[in-house]
């Protein structure tokens, strides 16, 4: 009997999971369901620089980094959206940078603290401390479509549809349902009210001469993309509005230009806002269910709550979610 697997969410988490499930269970019928076009998801706009916020997620990040290294070796970057970038993170708090070192200093390449002379040479308005490293960046508007293409090549079907209740999918014959619904993940789960939005805004500007990422304390930054440079951002918890205001633009540009005056009066090519699906911890959990309507037994695998680290952690957490999917199928002998 062919197992039917539904994955809710077409962002980086849903597509990473769908590809791994299709590879791990090649005889399954895998369907990805999304209630909006990819361009309207939180995964479309990010430049995707590798950086781990929470040391507890180190292993997920390491798994993702290894996957990016594989893509870098074997595929063209203009197709995958994955490329190597070097750059700097500045802070007046050495402790914050030491936390970064513990979280991923031995995962990325060339991680080190800059000497005072280097900081003064490089930055017109320098912070007290600065780290340098080389890592992968994954452009959302290329990387996720690449994952989707790989899924479709393995027979995964993509449908635009709003799922209001997980049980409705069980009643349609799905044996395993993977909840990668991001900000809606807790609502769909029905037992989790801990997911909340962190509003983000970035500007795409023309600055072909700018080749390195540059951060000041994780909110003010630039990340080069293939044809533009991203300037960001804001991190506003529990704000649901997506409209980009003049206040947003002025705030972001003034903060970054104070850090790097050469970027003053940039030509803005585009802008994007999104709601990061935040949670205290990422939820990766298998729950056995039974439909009240039909009596059908089914399994839900929850996989959501990545906040702003979806691109850094998503492949690694999808490895764990896929293990739970396989475990569910083995238990039911499908």
Swiss-Prot record:
Disulfide links within the chain: none
GO CC terms of this entry: cytoplasm; peroxisomal matrix
Signal peptide as annotated in the record: none
Activity regulation summary: Not inhibited by potassium bromide or thiolactomycin.
InterPro entries: D-amino_acid_oxidase_CS, DAO, FAD-dep_OxRdtase
EC number(s) reported in the record: 1.4.3.1
Annotated localization: Peroxisome matrix
A Gene Ontology BP annotation from the UniProt entry: D-amino acid catabolic process
Keywords from the named record: FAD, Flavoprotein, Oxidoreductase, Peroxisome
Gene3D superfamilies: D-Amino Acid Oxidase, subunit A, domain 2, NAD(P)-binding Rossmann-like Domain
Disruption phenotype: Mutant worms have decreased egg-laying capacity at 20 degrees Celsius and decreased hatching rate and smaller brood size at 25 degrees Celsius. Mutant worms have high D-Asp and D-Glu content at both egg and young adult stage but do not show any change in physical appearance. Mutant worms also exhibit decreased fertilization rates.
Database matches in PANTHER family: D-AMINO ACID OXIDASE, D-ASPARTATE OXIDASE 1
Protein task: Selectively catalyzes the oxidative deamination of acidic amino acids. May play a role in the egg-laying events and early development of the worm, in addition to quality control of the germ cells.
Protein name (Swiss-Prot/TrEMBL): D-aspartate oxidase 1
Lineage: Eukaryota, Metazoa, Ecdysozoa, Nematoda, Chromadorea
Encoding gene (name): ddo-1
